[in-house]
């Protein structure tokens, strides 16, 4: 069970990083 929770946390953190990088690159292109 704890492994499943850790996997979900990893996915959320990974997608959060990917989204942050994508938005950052988009903002740089707009500027």
Curated annotation (Swiss-Prot):
Nucleotidyltransferase listed as a keyword: no
One Pfam family named in its UniProt record: PetL
Primary location group: plastid
MF (Gene Ontology): electron transporter, transferring electrons within cytochrome b6/f complex of photosystem II activity
GO biological process: photosynthesis
Any one Gene Ontology cellular component term annotated for this protein: chloroplast thylakoid membrane
InterPro entries (UniProt xref): Cyt_b6/f_cplx_su6
Keywords assigned by UniProt, alphabetized: Chloroplast, Electron transport, Membrane, Photosynthesis, Plastid, Thylakoid, Transmembrane, Transmembrane helix, Transport
Subunit structure comment from the entry: The 4 large subunits of the cytochrome b6-f complex are cytochrome b6, subunit IV (17 kDa polypeptide, PetD), cytochrome f and the Rieske protein, while the 4 small subunits are PetG, PetL, PetM and PetN. The complex functions as a dimer.
Similarity comment: family membership: Belongs to the PetL family.
Functional description taken from the UniProt entry: Component of the cytochrome b6-f complex, which mediates electron transfer between photosystem II (PSII) and photosystem I (PSI), cyclic electron flow around PSI, and state transitions. PetL is important for photoautotrophic growth as well as for electron transfer efficiency and stability of the cytochrome b6-f complex.
Protein name: Cytochrome b6-f complex subunit 6
């Amino acid at each position: 069970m704890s492994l499943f929770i850790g996997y979900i946390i990893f996915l959320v953190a990974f997608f959060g990083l990917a989204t942050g990088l994508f938005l950052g690159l988009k903002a740089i292109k707009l500027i």
